[in-house]
């Protein structure tokens, strides 16, 4: 098993309220980016449904230089209708993220929780301060 030191939260950078599946995100990454699979390990749908992406045992493709020891979690949304960054998480997404993060912190107690924007300066993703919001998990 690979070491897990970080859990990194992302958004799909899609408009508020627009549904996208893990299969769609996988296609964006495989066909659009030329990757071999979806970059994230989990996708959180608008209704809070959790879909799996890459297996945890496999390094993701979500933050350059930090994939080997992290888990990538993405929620669907993160932009307003004009494609400006906005925290668009539904109540169901917030609850699902919190539940998943608690599970992951139990499984990987030394892992810290971060937003993508903490590693990639200039990015708004995940459109909220994940490190601050989840600091006490």
Question: What are these language model-derived features?
Answer:
Residues 1-37:
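Cell wall/extracellular polymer interaction/catalysis modules
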Residues 1-12, 16, 46-50, 55, ...:
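Basic/polar, cationic surfaces and motifs that engage anionic cell-wall
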Residues 59-63:
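Flexible, surface-exposed loop/gating regions in the mature catalytic domains
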């Amino acid at each position: 098993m690979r070491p897990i030191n970080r859990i990194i939260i992302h958004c799909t950078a899609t408009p508020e309220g627009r549904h996208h599946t893990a299969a769609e995100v996988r296609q964006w990454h495989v066909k659009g980016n030329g990757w071999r699979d979806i970059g994230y390990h989990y996708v959180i749908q608008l209704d809070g449904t959790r879909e799996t992406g890459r297996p945890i045992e496999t390094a993701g493709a979500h933050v350059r230089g930090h994939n080997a020891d992290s888990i990538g979690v993405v929620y669907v949304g993160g932009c307003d209708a004009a494609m400006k960054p906005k925290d668009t998480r539904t109540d169901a997404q917030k609850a699902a993220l919190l539940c998943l993060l608690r599970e992951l912190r139990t499984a990987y107690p030394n892992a810290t929780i971060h937003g993508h924007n903490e590693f990639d300066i200039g990015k708004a993703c995940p459109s909220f301060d994940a490190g601050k919001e989840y600091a006490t998990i």
